[in-house]
């Protein structure tokens, strides 16, 4: 099975922009964790796209495909081609180890119409990069890589519709989507729409309104302001009172921003495995978030660090999945554990930073569990886990 892992930030999504070091590091951490998990599974061949400004990495099983036709040293062709209609084979490759394991063909739970999946019986193991340069069109390159794959695992922010566009492209090319369905992706792209959707279905949420309707919160402050389609803590700010918030809003404008009351509580997250409206709560995570000069800074967290709250968080995980049946595979839920009970902040229909330590925390391979969802029901996969807290450190590079 050839899997194209498309990590947006490190994989070419910012080719014509300066690469933010923090975002690139966070993307690389998630990418490396996922690739490590996939690489040990039998019959899996991995291809990545890579911004050529970044180092390739040190994994022993690299092969390299260069979009400018610069062949890697001693290139070797792939032994097998994908037998999916319209597929293409990368131009040059370099591999190391081999294996005789091959996957069994299986149907996709979420794919475009009209193409029968036949699988890829490859005996060559490798992890490949398609190097993208500033002169390249990342979306065209990704389309080619999607066509050359059997399945695609998107890791992209909701910001600007990037994840939704990538999801649509995968399905348009009739490939297996190893991620959430378009309806869930589009809903989660708006924090405001997500909160309203969950609240209408009885899920406890943090009160959220458009910035222009801050009076509806009926509180003098403090307030938290963030982009409606933002990812992580990017551009999330604290305002101590209404006057400061109003002055800032007058300068920046209210469009595209949401406001929430600041709630003193524990910033936690949930790592879920989802399918057809059901959820398996893999881990309850602690998040490290600090406020520096009235800006929220995400410093990482501890996967499995809030397992003591599992009994309280499992009903929330179930309720979120039931309210958003388009969640499939891995999904993250951010919440605040406040004195009156936990409240959901947002839903992430993609890998989150907690995935970096998730495998170590679970003592299991989360990528393997997710791939099993292609053929098996969630209830068949679920089993007891002995969870050990594992940290993810994201101290800012400029700290």
What is each stretch, according to the model?
Residues 80-82, 112-114, 124-125:
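Glycine-biased, low-complexity coil/linker segments
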Residues 29, 33, 37-38, 45-72, ...:
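Conserved N-proximal alpha/beta basic substrate-recognition cap immediately N-terminal to
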Residues 170-175, 181-265, 276-279, 302-315:
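Active-site nucleotide/adenylate-binding loops and adjacent lid/helix of ATP-dependent enzymes
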Residues 327-339:
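A short glycine-rich, hydrophobically flanked beta-strand micro-motif that places a catalytic Asp/Glu
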Residues 260-325, 337, 348-374, 393-395:
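ATP-dependent carboxylate/phosphate-activation module, predominantly the ATP-grasp catalytic core
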Residues 1-23:
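Nucleotide-activated donor-dependent transferases that construct or modify glycoconjugates
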Residues 116-123, 338, 369-399:
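Peripheral (often C-terminal) accessory segments that flank ATP-dependent C-N-forming ligase machineries
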């Amino acid at each position: 099975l050839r899997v194209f892992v498309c990590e947006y930030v490190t994989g070419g999504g910012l080719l014509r922009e300066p690469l933010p070091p923090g975002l690139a590091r966070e993307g690389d951490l998630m990418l490396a964790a996922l690739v490590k998990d996939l690489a040990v599974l039998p019959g899996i061949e991995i291809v990545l796209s890579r911004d050529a400004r970044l180092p390739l990495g040190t994994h022993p099983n690299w092969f390299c495909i260069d979009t400018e036709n610069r062949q890697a040293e001693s290139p070797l062709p792939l032994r097998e081609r994908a037998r999916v209609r319209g597929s293409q084979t990368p131009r040059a490759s370099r591999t190391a180890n081999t294996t005789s394991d091959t996957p069994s063909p299986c149907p996709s739970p979420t794919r475009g119409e009209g193409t029968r999946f036949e699988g890829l019986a490859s005996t060559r193991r490798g992890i490949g990069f398609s190097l993208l340069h500033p002169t390249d069109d990342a979306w065209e390159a990704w389309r080619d890589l999607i066509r050359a794959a059997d399945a695609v695992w998107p890791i992209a922010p909701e910001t600007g519709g990037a994840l939704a566009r990538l999801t649509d492209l995968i399905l348009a090319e009739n490939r297996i989507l190893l991620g959430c369905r378009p309806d869930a992706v589009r809903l989660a792209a708006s924090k405001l729409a997500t909160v309203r959707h969950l609240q209408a279905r009885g899920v406890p949420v943090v009160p959220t309104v458009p910035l222009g309707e801050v009076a509806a919160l009926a509180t003098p402050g403090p307030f938290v302001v963030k982009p409606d389609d933002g990812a992580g803590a990017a551009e999330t700010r604290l305002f101590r009172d209404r006057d400061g918030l109003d002055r800032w809003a007058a300068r920046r404008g209210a469009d595209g921003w949401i406001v929430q009351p600041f709630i003193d509580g524990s910033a936690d997250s949930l790592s879920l495995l989802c399918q057809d409206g059901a959820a398996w709560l893999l881990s309850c995570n602690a998040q490290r978030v600090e406020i520096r000069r009235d800006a929220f800074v995400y410093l990482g967290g501890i996967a499995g660090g809030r397992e003591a709250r599992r009994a309280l968080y499992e009903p929330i995980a179930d309720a979120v999945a039931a309210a958003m049946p388009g969640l499939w595979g891995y999904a993250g839920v951010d919440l605040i554990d406040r004195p009156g009970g936990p409240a959901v902040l947002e839903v992430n229909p993609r890998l989150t930073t907690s995935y970096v330590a998730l495998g170590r925390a679970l003592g299991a391979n989360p990528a393997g569990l997710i791939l099993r969802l292609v053929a098996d029901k969630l209830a068949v996969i679920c089993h007891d886990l002995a969870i050990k807290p594992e940290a993810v450190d994201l101290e800012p590079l400029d700290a």
